[in-house]
Each structure stands twice: as structure tokens, then as C-alpha cells.
Design a protein with these regions (language model features):
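C-terminal-of-GTPase-core extension/linker across diverse P-loop GTPases
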Residues: 2-8, 13, 19, 147-354, ...
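Short capping/connector residues at structural and topological boundaries
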Residues: 6, 35, 40-43, 50-52, ...
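Conserved Switch II/interswitch segment of TRAFAC-class P-loop GTPases
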Residues: 43-48, 75-85, 96-157, 172-185, ...
Length: 365
């Protein structure tokens, strides 16, 4: 399940520095000038999962395979991007191809790092980005209305549904609100996603702070947190510069460095988990002598759907899922203990998988 999160923001806010740290490479050219990221950089990132290590230790498993999520570093946006200013058209197309958006805002003062607007104001940065995305959505939708109306009048049900959703989105956008604020019925969600609206994607606000503010945040990041709450977005505080330094250290040095900063873990771990949560994802595990593995599914997925993530044959020929809750598996030290304690369950097709379930699937094709 290769889901993508776009890392977006104005030039010189720390997007590429953050991306470099996420991928532990210098693939994104982090430079102090606009548009240093011209082609989108895609990084395949492991989702931090302490539970997986504990499960692997019980068996023990030879290999540990975490869940993964993709981050995309795209070119810095400038005012007028919706009209093609800067690298606007390319920027917008790159976002359209992702599942969620992480808005990176600059929450630090540094005279050596220029700001494209001439001053540091994270809320103004958010307004600029959101406005450009809303304008792009408005233009995209308005172009479709006349054709959809014509086709809907012929009795085309699909066009009628799309037209209804287009008008729903236009109502929000014309009121100055992103499309994600619209209330979409469950039966319309697939058609809604097909609109590929930039402002309908789940949003994560990332406050990029200086080293001194990495543990507690600062006045600017507090303002961003308040805006995130108002906008229904998630929020995380991180110091991209610190994270880039941490990424180059070995595990022992990393722990010591974090302690000196008053941190218990890298900020990137929080960012990755927030992105995972933002996409409505959860994890189940398969465990054996060969490997312990985390699998990514959507919240609410049934056992057959979870099996299908491993292989489509597992879903097509699903018979049952042998299931143990994570806490029971660890507390009872594996499958044998869970069986003895009556915590080993046989679940059928209607079972909704819970986060952390340890599963084995029986199927026939």
C-alpha cells in the first residue's frame, strides 16, 4: 500500500532539509534559494513501530520488516502558483498525485536564511499556500460544470453525482474554506476522491522550529497549532536542522544527543506517525521464524481485506483469520501461551481488524 504524503511550503522553510532527514540522504538539494527542488523527490520511509521489535524477539524472527510510507518533496510554492507563477503548474500537479499534504511552516528567525515574502510569518505562509490551492481547485471545478450539467440532463447518473459533488466543493471554496471541510456521504467518497481536489486532501501542519524550541515549541509554533485546531488539521513541531544532524549519528550517539535536547525520540518519528494517522491507517502483524512484519491497512478494513494486502489470492480464497491481540501475544509470550489462555481466536469474513492484531490467514484458491 504505497501511500504518499506531499511535503509542501514556501521556498526556504526547510522542506528539503526535512525530507533529507526523513530519507537519511542528501537526495533533495537543500539550498538557500527558491526552487532548489525542481523535480519531486520521493522517499520510501519506514514507520517507527516498537511493537514489531517486541514481537520479533518472542519468536525470535530472523528479519524485521516495518510498514512504509512515501514522502514527496515538491518545489517551493510562491504567490500566484495557481496561475503558473514560479513552478506553479508543476507544483500543483505533484500535489494532486498524493494522498495527504504536510504543510511545512517556518517558525524560526535566521538572518542567514532568506524568506521569499521578506518576513517570517507562519500563518501568512499557510494562508498563501491554502489560497493558491483553493484557487487552483476553483479553476479546475468551474471548467467542468457546463459539461457535467449537459450530460446530467441526458440522465447520466454518474455525471449527476459528480455535478452534485462539484457544487458541494464549490460551495466550500467560494466561502473561503478548503474542500476538506465539505460533509461527504459515505456512498460518495469514491467519486469525491476522483475529483482530485488539492484542498480535499487530509492536512498536517509542520512547525519547523530552531534547536532551542525543538522540545517545547515557541510562540510561532503555538500560533500554527491554534490554526491547525481551527482548520481540523493535525500538527507537529520539529526542528528540521536537528533531525538532519540526528540522521547522521549512530544509535548510541543519537540517544545521547536527544537527551541533551530534552527529547525522548527523534521528531521525525512523530511526523511519520502523524502522517500514518492522517491517512486513516493502522497496522496488523504477521510473525514467524523467518520474519516479523507490519502490514498497513485502513481503519475499518475486514479480515479478508487485510489478507488481500499480502496477496489478492488470500482475499479471494479467504476462509478464516487466526487472530491474537498484540497485548495478549506479548503478555502470554507467543501463540502457544495465547492458545492455552484462550486468547487465540478464529475470525470470519465480517471481522474488523483491530490495530496491532497478530494474524495468520487460512485460504483456499
Amino acid at each position: 500500500m504505497a501511500l504518499k504524503v506531499a511535503i509542501v511550503g514556501l521556498p526556504n522553510v526547510g522542506k528539503s532539509t526535512l525530507f533529507n532527514a526523513l530519507t537519511q540522504t542528501a537526495a533533495a538539494q537543500a539550498a538557500n534559494f527558491p526552487f532548489c527542488t525542481i523535480e519531486p523527490n520521493v522517499g520510501d520511509v519506514a514507520v517507527p513501530e516498537p511493537r514489531l521489535d517486541k514481537l520479533a524477539a518472542i519468536i525470535p524472527s530472523k528479519e524485521i520488516i516495518p510498514a512504509r510510507i512515501n514522502f514527496v518533496d515538491v518545489a517551493g510554492l510562491v504567490r500566484g502558483a495557481s496561475k503558473g507563477e514560479g513552478l506553479g503548474n508543476q507544483f500543483l500537479a505533484n500535489i494532486r498525485d498524493t494522498d495527504a499534504v504536510a504543510f511545512v511552516t517556518r517558525c524560526f528567525i535566521d538572518d542567514d536564511v532568506t524568506h521569499v515574502e521578506g518576513k517570517v510569518d507562519p500563518l501568512a505562509d499557510l494562508e498563501t499556500i491554502e489560497t493558491e490551492l483553493m484557487l487552483a481547485d476553483l479553476e479546475s471545478l468551474e471548467k467542468r460544470v457546463a459539461n457535467l450539467e449537459k450530460r446530467a440532463k441526458t440522465g447520466d447518473k454518474e455525471s449527476a453525482q459528480t455535478l452534485r459533488l462539484v457544487n458541494l466543493a464549490l460551495t466550500e471554496l467560494n466561502a473561503g474554506r478548503p474542500a476538506r471541510k465539505a460533509k461527504v456521504a459515505a456512498e460518495d467518497e469514491k467519486a469525491w476522491r476522483m475529483l482530485q481536489l488539492l484542498t480535499s486532501k487530509p492536512a498536517l501542519y509542520v512547525s519547523n522550529v530552531d534547536e532551542a524550541s525543538a522540545a517545547t515549541g515557541n510562540e510561532m509554533s503555538n500560533l500554527v497549532a491554534q490554526r491547525a485546531k481551527r482548520d481540523g488539521a493535525d500538527h507537529v513541531v520539529i526542528s528540521a536542522q536537528i533531525e538532519s544532524e540526528i540522521a547522521m549519528l549512530d544509535p548510541a550517539e543519537r540517544t545521547e544527543f536527544l537527551e541533551t535536547l530534552g527529547l525522548t525520540e527523534p521528531g521525525l518519528n512523530k511526523l511519520i506517525r502523524e502522517a500514518y494517522h492522517l491517512l486513516g491507517l493502522q497496522t496488523y502483524f504477521t510473525v514467524g521464524p523467518k520474519e516479523a512484519r507490519a502490514w498497513t491497512i485502513h481503519k475499518g478494513d475486514t479480515a479478508p481485506q487485510a489478507a488481500g494486502v499480502i496477496h489478492t489470492d488470500f482475499e479471494k480464497g479467504f476462509i478464516r483469520a487466526e487472530t491474537i491481540a498484540y497485548d495478549d501475544y506479548v503478555r502470554l509470550k507467543g501463540e502457544a501461551g495465547a492458545r492455552e489462555a484462550g486468547k487465540f481466536r478464529q475470525e470470519g469474513k465480517e471481522y474488523v481488524v483491530q490495530d496491532g492484531d497478530v494474524m495468520n490467514f487460512r485460504f483456499n484458491v
